């Protein structure tokens, strides 16, 4: 399989109080985004996202980029079905023209965004991922 993704962040490491709930939540959203997830009873790894069990010291905002609005909608619905809590349904935002996003809280209260930038793309050039 080969994917082309924009890059801005090297990696994000989250702690989850309930790793199984986080595994369900992230597998649902990342499955819609066609991102492979590897997990066991201690970890979840999906590209630059690493999650392990432990106590949180703070919450984060994490945004996943998509190539179209339909994928934003689908990922938001998948996240809700997998135990996420609505934090702003799919729609245009005023950050810049064409910014279309949806927000959910993951099982640990992190603010998860799925975004399509539309014509005003500001992401880095894509890299080729082969696995």
Give the positions of each predicted feature:
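Vicinal oxygen chelate
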Residues: 17-19, 64-108
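Short beta->alpha transition motifs characteristic of CBS
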Residues: 97, 103, 114-121
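C-terminal "cap" of GNAT-fold acetyltransferases
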Residues: 3-9, 40-55, 131
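Helix-adjacent hinge/juxtasegments
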Residues: 54-55, 60-66
